[in-house]
Amino acid sequence: MHKHNNGLKTAALFGVLWAVLLGLGAIIAAGTRSTTPIWIMALIGVATTAYGYWNSDKIAIRSMAAYPVTEAQAPQLYQIVRELSVRANKPMPRIYLSPTMTPNAFATGRNPKNAAVCCTEGILHLLDARELRGVLGHELMHVYNRDILTSSVVAAVAGVITSVGQMLLIFGSGDRRNANPLATIAMALLAPFAASLIQMAISRTREFDADEDGAELTGDPLALASALRKIESGVSQLPLPPDQRLVNASHLMIANPFRGGGIRRMFSTHPPMKERISRLERMAGRPLL
């Protein structure tokens, strides 16, 4: 029931995201007295969704300067991923390594047959084999649950909404053909905000599910809890720079790779680490020491 409810929640939020995009089109249409902008917004949404679907793996891997590794180069990674893939009765994904020393990992790809798992050099140095197994279990469940498709498409549509909102704010309010400039300004400001909230809610739901499903796959919730605690500490000491390419791919990572608190943390696509660890402790029936 829990997973079913989360699936319905994700579908509903994605529907709202599309409604926001079409709402932007409606505001533009009201100003221009034409339905063409609505169709343009719909086409942009479809094109962006298709692009996110087909290129999610390439975008994320490129942003982290990751490269494929062979079993001879990363025997431990291959051993763990192969074991968990067999346990789940799923195809084994391609394995990549990113040279960054910030500890993190992510999975990407539109489906299990076209998936890739990437670890950073930093996470391999930081975690022991048991903790790394917990992280890889989490990432594989993102693949098997097709969360990468969901998160990539949501991020792409949210990005379109933000861009269109900025264009409306710059050009739309001063257009003399616009019958309601105040509504245009309000929509231009609120639509990107709403898109960010929706993206955050969907991403957090999928992260909690991947934690739970990954812990079930490995049979060791506390291994993932211990890894998350170490990763949080490692990121705080060596965060990624807020480069836009990295920001665009950050929703795929197991932990928020940037330093920040306050408002930035409130609107993070990742749930609070303390809550994630607490849930895993409840699964294990005992606290992480």
UniProtKB/Swiss-Prot annotation:
Say if the entry is tagged with keyword Zinc: yes
Q: Which residues bind Zn(2+)?
A: H138, H142, E207
Q: Name one GO biological process term.
A: proteolysis
Cofactor(s) of this protein: Zn(2+)
Catalytic residues in the record: E139
The GO molecular function terms of this record are: metalloendopeptidase activity; zinc ion binding
**Segments traversing the membrane:** 11-31, 34-54, 152-172, 182-202
| Keyword Cell membrane listed | yes
User: Per the UniProt record, which EC number(s) apply here?
Assistant: 3.4.24.-
Query: Which InterPro entries does the protein's record reference?
Result: HtpX_protease (IPR050083), Pept_M48_protease_HtpX (IPR022919), Peptidase_M48 (IPR001915)
What superkingdom does the record give? Bacteria
What's the protein name? Protease HtpX homolog
Instruction: Name the coiled-coil region(s).
Output: none
What is the topology of this protein in the membrane according to its UniProt annotation?
Multi-pass membrane protein
Question: Where does the protein end up?
Answer: Cell membrane
Q: Which family does it belong to?
A: Belongs to the peptidase M48B family.
Cellular component aspect of the GO annotation: plasma membrane
